[in-house]
Protein backbone atom coordinates (compact mmCIF):
# COMPACT_ATOMS: atom_id res chain seq x y z
CA UNK A 1 0.00 0.00 0.00
CA UNK A 2 1.47 3.34 -1.03
CA UNK A 3 1.65 6.37 1.20
CA UNK A 4 -0.31 8.71 -1.04
CA UNK A 5 -2.94 11.37 -0.90
CA UNK A 6 -4.87 13.10 -3.66
CA UNK A 7 -6.89 16.18 -2.83
CA UNK A 8 -9.84 15.89 -5.22
CA UNK A 9 -12.66 18.33 -5.66
CA UNK A 10 -15.14 18.78 -8.48
CA UNK A 11 -13.76 20.24 -11.69
CA UNK A 12 -15.88 20.52 -14.85
CA UNK A 13 -14.75 19.04 -18.13
CA UNK A 14 -12.76 21.52 -20.18
CA UNK A 15 -14.87 20.99 -23.31
CA UNK A 16 -18.54 20.56 -24.11
CA UNK A 17 -19.87 18.93 -27.28
CA UNK A 18 -19.56 22.17 -29.26
CA UNK A 19 -15.92 22.61 -28.26
CA UNK A 20 -15.06 19.05 -29.25
CA UNK A 21 -16.73 19.42 -32.65
CA UNK A 22 -15.00 22.74 -33.27
CA UNK A 23 -11.57 21.35 -32.33
CA UNK A 24 -12.13 18.20 -34.37
CA UNK A 25 -13.02 20.26 -37.44
CA UNK A 26 -9.83 22.28 -37.01
CA UNK A 27 -7.71 19.17 -36.48
CA UNK A 28 -9.20 17.55 -39.59
CA UNK A 29 -8.94 20.74 -41.65
CA UNK A 30 -12.65 20.60 -42.51
CA UNK A 31 -15.02 23.48 -43.07
CA UNK A 32 -18.50 23.42 -41.61
CA UNK A 33 -19.97 22.90 -45.09
CA UNK A 34 -17.69 19.97 -45.91
CA UNK A 35 -18.52 18.35 -42.56
CA UNK A 36 -22.23 18.80 -43.27
CA UNK A 37 -21.85 17.05 -46.62
CA UNK A 38 -19.80 14.17 -45.21
CA UNK A 39 -22.01 13.60 -42.16
CA UNK A 40 -25.36 14.38 -43.79
CA UNK A 41 -26.12 16.71 -40.87
CA UNK A 42 -27.46 20.16 -41.70
CA UNK A 43 -24.82 22.89 -41.61
CA UNK A 44 -27.05 25.07 -39.43
CA UNK A 45 -27.34 22.31 -36.83
CA UNK A 46 -23.56 21.96 -36.74
CA UNK A 47 -23.17 25.72 -36.26
CA UNK A 48 -25.79 25.69 -33.49
CA UNK A 49 -23.92 22.86 -31.73
CA UNK A 50 -20.62 24.75 -31.91
CA UNK A 51 -22.46 27.73 -30.39
CA UNK A 52 -23.73 25.48 -27.53
CA UNK A 53 -27.29 25.26 -28.88
CA UNK A 54 -27.74 21.53 -29.08
CA UNK A 55 -30.46 19.96 -31.21
CA UNK A 56 -28.65 16.90 -32.53
CA UNK A 57 -30.17 13.44 -32.52
CA UNK A 58 -28.09 10.45 -31.35
CA UNK A 59 -27.87 9.31 -34.98
CA UNK A 60 -26.58 12.72 -36.09
CA UNK A 61 -23.94 12.68 -33.35
CA UNK A 62 -22.85 9.23 -34.54
CA UNK A 63 -22.57 10.46 -38.14
CA UNK A 64 -20.62 13.55 -37.07
CA UNK A 65 -18.26 11.40 -35.04
CA UNK A 66 -17.68 9.04 -37.96
CA UNK A 67 -17.06 11.93 -40.39
CA UNK A 68 -14.55 13.49 -37.99
CA UNK A 69 -12.96 10.12 -37.12
CA UNK A 70 -13.83 10.56 -33.44
CA UNK A 71 -14.54 7.98 -30.76
CA UNK A 72 -18.33 7.95 -31.05
CA UNK A 73 -18.90 6.39 -27.61
CA UNK A 74 -17.01 9.22 -25.92
CA UNK A 75 -18.57 11.90 -28.12
CA UNK A 76 -22.06 10.59 -27.33
CA UNK A 77 -21.28 10.54 -23.59
CA UNK A 78 -20.20 14.19 -23.72
CA UNK A 79 -23.37 15.06 -25.64
CA UNK A 80 -25.45 13.41 -22.90
CA UNK A 81 -23.49 15.15 -20.13
CA UNK A 82 -22.28 11.87 -18.65
CA UNK A 83 -18.66 11.48 -19.69
CA UNK A 84 -17.21 8.78 -17.39
CA UNK A 85 -14.38 9.67 -15.04
CA UNK A 86 -12.28 7.07 -13.20
CA UNK A 87 -11.39 6.65 -9.57
CA UNK A 88 -7.96 8.15 -8.96
CA UNK A 89 -5.70 5.85 -6.94
CA UNK A 90 -2.31 4.18 -6.80
CA UNK A 91 0.04 7.17 -6.76
CA UNK A 92 3.11 6.67 -4.53
CA UNK A 93 3.20 10.33 -3.50
CA UNK A 94 0.86 13.17 -2.60
CA UNK A 95 -0.83 15.17 -5.36
CA UNK A 96 -2.44 18.57 -4.81
CA UNK A 97 -4.47 19.96 -7.73
CA UNK A 98 -4.82 23.77 -7.58
CA UNK A 99 -7.93 24.90 -9.48
CA UNK A 100 -8.06 28.47 -10.79
CA UNK A 101 -11.30 29.89 -12.27
CA UNK A 102 -10.83 30.26 -16.03
CA UNK A 103 -13.80 31.16 -18.21
CA UNK A 104 -16.59 28.75 -17.31
CA UNK A 105 -14.05 26.10 -16.31
CA UNK A 106 -10.73 25.88 -14.50
CA UNK A 107 -7.02 26.16 -15.22
CA UNK A 108 -4.88 23.82 -13.15
CA UNK A 109 -1.54 23.90 -11.42
CA UNK A 110 -0.26 20.99 -9.34
CA UNK A 111 2.04 20.31 -6.43
CA UNK A 112 3.57 16.85 -6.07
CA UNK A 113 5.32 15.90 -2.84
CA UNK A 114 6.68 12.99 -0.92
CA UNK A 115 3.95 12.61 1.69
CA UNK A 116 6.55 12.70 4.47
CA UNK A 117 8.02 16.01 3.31
CA UNK A 118 6.98 19.68 3.50
CA UNK A 119 8.61 20.62 0.18
CA UNK A 120 6.83 20.04 -3.12
CA UNK A 121 7.43 20.15 -6.86
CA UNK A 122 5.23 22.75 -8.57
CA UNK A 123 3.85 22.21 -12.07
CA UNK A 124 2.66 25.50 -13.58
CA UNK A 125 1.81 28.47 -11.38
CA UNK A 126 -1.67 29.61 -12.41
CA UNK A 127 -2.71 33.06 -13.63
CA UNK A 128 -1.41 35.10 -10.69
CA UNK A 129 0.44 34.81 -7.41
CA UNK A 130 -2.39 35.89 -5.09
CA UNK A 131 -4.69 33.15 -6.36
CA UNK A 132 -1.83 30.67 -6.15
CA UNK A 133 -1.23 31.52 -2.50
CA UNK A 134 -4.93 31.22 -1.64
CA UNK A 135 -4.94 27.69 -3.02
CA UNK A 136 -1.55 26.66 -1.66
CA UNK A 137 -1.80 23.54 0.59
CA UNK A 138 -0.90 24.20 4.22
CA UNK A 139 1.24 21.08 4.43
CA UNK A 140 3.65 22.36 1.76
CA UNK A 141 5.96 24.97 3.27
CA UNK A 142 8.26 25.61 0.31
CA UNK A 143 8.54 24.71 -3.38
CA UNK A 144 11.46 22.47 -4.27
CA UNK A 145 11.33 23.15 -8.01
CA UNK A 146 8.98 24.62 -10.61
CA UNK A 147 8.18 23.05 -13.97
CA UNK A 148 6.31 25.00 -16.66
CA UNK A 149 4.40 23.11 -19.36
CA UNK A 150 3.87 26.10 -21.69
CA UNK A 151 3.65 29.86 -21.70
CA UNK A 152 -0.04 30.77 -21.73
CA UNK A 153 -0.82 33.31 -19.02
CA UNK A 154 -3.17 31.08 -17.05
CA UNK A 155 -0.33 28.59 -16.60
CA UNK A 156 2.61 30.82 -15.62
CA UNK A 157 1.14 34.15 -14.54
CA UNK A 158 2.16 33.56 -10.92
CA UNK A 159 5.72 32.49 -11.68
CA UNK A 160 7.68 35.72 -11.29
CA UNK A 161 6.15 36.65 -7.93
CA UNK A 162 6.49 33.10 -6.62
CA UNK A 163 10.22 33.20 -7.37
CA UNK A 164 10.51 36.67 -5.82
CA UNK A 165 8.85 35.51 -2.58
CA UNK A 166 10.53 32.11 -2.28
CA UNK A 167 14.06 32.94 -3.38
CA UNK A 168 16.43 30.61 -5.15
CA UNK A 169 14.21 27.89 -6.66
CA UNK A 170 15.16 25.93 -9.79
CA UNK A 171 12.76 26.60 -12.66
CA UNK A 172 12.41 24.41 -15.75
CA UNK A 173 10.59 25.15 -19.00
CA UNK A 174 10.30 23.77 -22.55
CA UNK A 175 13.05 24.26 -25.08
CA UNK A 176 12.33 27.28 -27.26
CA UNK A 177 10.72 29.31 -24.46
CA UNK A 178 12.90 31.92 -22.81
CA UNK A 179 12.00 32.45 -19.15
CA UNK A 180 14.48 34.44 -17.11
CA UNK A 181 16.46 32.14 -14.84
CA UNK A 182 14.81 28.97 -16.17
CA UNK A 183 16.58 25.90 -17.54
CA UNK A 184 15.14 24.64 -20.83
CA UNK A 185 14.43 20.90 -20.94
CA UNK A 186 14.15 18.77 -24.05
CA UNK A 187 12.88 15.26 -24.70
CA UNK A 188 13.95 12.66 -22.16
CA UNK A 189 15.49 14.95 -19.54
CA UNK A 190 15.36 13.36 -16.07
CA UNK A 191 15.66 15.11 -12.73
CA UNK A 192 15.56 13.57 -9.26
CA UNK A 193 14.12 15.20 -6.14
CA UNK A 194 14.50 12.87 -3.17
CA UNK A 195 12.32 9.82 -3.86
CA UNK A 196 10.70 11.39 -6.92
CA UNK A 197 11.83 11.55 -10.53
CA UNK A 198 10.53 13.93 -13.22
CA UNK A 199 10.97 13.02 -16.89
CA UNK A 200 10.31 15.38 -19.79
CA UNK A 201 8.23 14.63 -22.88
CA UNK A 202 8.46 17.22 -25.65
CA UNK A 203 4.89 17.72 -26.92
CA UNK A 204 4.47 20.67 -29.32
CA UNK A 205 1.08 21.15 -30.94
CA UNK A 206 -1.05 23.43 -28.78
CA UNK A 207 1.94 25.77 -28.93
CA UNK A 208 5.48 25.20 -30.18
CA UNK A 209 7.37 25.13 -26.85
CA UNK A 210 5.30 22.65 -24.82
CA UNK A 211 6.36 19.90 -22.42
CA UNK A 212 4.51 17.20 -20.56
CA UNK A 213 6.11 15.73 -17.45
CA UNK A 214 6.06 12.18 -16.08
CA UNK A 215 6.44 11.91 -12.29
CA UNK A 216 7.40 8.58 -10.75
CA UNK A 217 8.83 7.14 -7.55
CA UNK A 218 11.57 4.75 -8.76
CA UNK A 219 11.51 2.90 -5.44
CA UNK A 220 7.89 1.95 -6.21
CA UNK A 221 8.14 0.66 -9.80
CA UNK A 222 4.68 -0.91 -9.86
CA UNK A 223 2.92 2.24 -8.66
CA UNK A 224 0.95 4.48 -11.00
CA UNK A 225 2.93 7.20 -12.79
CA UNK A 226 1.61 10.75 -13.03
CA UNK A 227 1.41 12.59 -16.35
CA UNK A 228 1.22 16.39 -16.10
CA UNK A 229 -0.21 16.92 -19.57
CA UNK A 230 -0.56 20.69 -19.88
CA UNK A 231 -2.73 21.55 -22.88
CA UNK A 232 -2.09 18.33 -24.81
CA UNK A 233 -4.55 15.86 -23.26
CA UNK A 234 -7.70 16.58 -21.23
CA UNK A 235 -10.39 14.35 -19.79
CA UNK A 236 -12.74 13.99 -22.74
CA UNK A 237 -10.81 16.21 -25.12
CA UNK A 238 -7.49 17.57 -26.33
CA UNK A 239 -5.83 20.95 -26.59
CA UNK A 240 -6.50 23.37 -29.42
CA UNK A 241 -3.91 23.14 -32.20
CA UNK A 242 -2.84 26.78 -32.18
CA UNK A 243 0.62 25.82 -33.44
CA UNK A 244 0.39 22.59 -35.45
CA UNK A 245 -2.52 20.15 -35.65
CA UNK A 246 -0.43 17.25 -37.01
CA UNK A 247 2.06 17.50 -34.15
CA UNK A 248 -0.70 17.82 -31.56
CA UNK A 249 -2.46 14.73 -32.91
CA UNK A 250 0.82 12.79 -33.07
CA UNK A 251 1.76 13.68 -29.50
CA UNK A 252 -1.74 12.97 -28.20
CA UNK A 253 -1.68 9.48 -29.68
CA UNK A 254 1.89 8.95 -28.51
CA UNK A 255 0.87 9.61 -24.89
CA UNK A 256 -2.10 7.29 -25.09
CA UNK A 257 -0.17 4.52 -26.86
CA UNK A 258 3.08 4.53 -24.89
CA UNK A 259 2.14 5.27 -21.28
CA UNK A 260 0.86 2.57 -18.90
CA UNK A 261 -2.91 2.48 -18.60
CA UNK A 262 -2.61 3.08 -14.84
CA UNK A 263 -1.05 6.50 -15.48
CA UNK A 264 -2.95 9.29 -13.73
CA UNK A 265 -3.39 12.29 -16.02
CA UNK A 266 -3.22 15.78 -14.49
CA UNK A 267 -4.28 18.13 -17.31
CA UNK A 268 -3.94 21.89 -17.65
CA UNK A 269 -7.74 22.21 -17.60
CA UNK A 270 -10.56 20.05 -16.27
CA UNK A 271 -10.57 17.04 -13.94
CA UNK A 272 -8.04 14.28 -13.34
CA UNK A 273 -8.34 11.17 -15.45
CA UNK A 274 -6.28 8.11 -16.44
CA UNK A 275 -4.69 6.85 -19.62
CA UNK A 276 -6.97 3.79 -19.49
CA UNK A 277 -10.07 5.97 -19.30
CA UNK A 278 -9.00 8.21 -22.17
CA UNK A 279 -8.06 5.26 -24.38
CA UNK A 280 -11.61 4.03 -23.94
CA UNK A 281 -13.62 7.23 -24.14
CA UNK A 282 -11.69 10.29 -25.33
CA UNK A 283 -13.37 11.47 -28.56
CA UNK A 284 -9.99 12.14 -30.17
CA UNK A 285 -8.96 8.49 -29.85
CA UNK A 286 -10.27 6.60 -32.85
Segments from the language model and where they lie:
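Core dinuclear metal-dependent hydrolase active-site scaffold
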Residues: 111, 190-222
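Recognition helix of helix-turn-helix/homeodomain-like DNA-binding domains
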Residues: 41-56
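A short, Lys/Arg-rich alpha-helix, primarily the initiator
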Residues: 1-28
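Conserved beta-strand hairpin/beta-sheet module of binuclear metal-dependent hydrolase folds
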Residues: 87-138, 213-229, 235-236
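Metallo-beta-lactamase
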Residues: 7, 11, 118, 207-286
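Active-site HxH/HxHxD metal-binding segment of metal-dependent hydrolases
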Residues: 55, 127-199
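Short alpha-helical "recognition helix" segments of helix-turn-helix
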Residues: 31-38, 64
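DNA major-groove recognition helix of helix-turn-helix/homeodomain DNA-binding modules
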Residues: 59-74
Amino acid sequence: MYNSRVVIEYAPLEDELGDVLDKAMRHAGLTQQVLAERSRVASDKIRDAIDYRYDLTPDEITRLGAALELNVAGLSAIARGCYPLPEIAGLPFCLYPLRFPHGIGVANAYIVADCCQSRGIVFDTGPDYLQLRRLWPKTIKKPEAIFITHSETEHLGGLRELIAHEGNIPVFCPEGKKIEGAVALGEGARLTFGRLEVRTLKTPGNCEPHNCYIVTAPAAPTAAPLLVSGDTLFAGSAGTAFYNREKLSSNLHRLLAELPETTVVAPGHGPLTTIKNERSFNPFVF
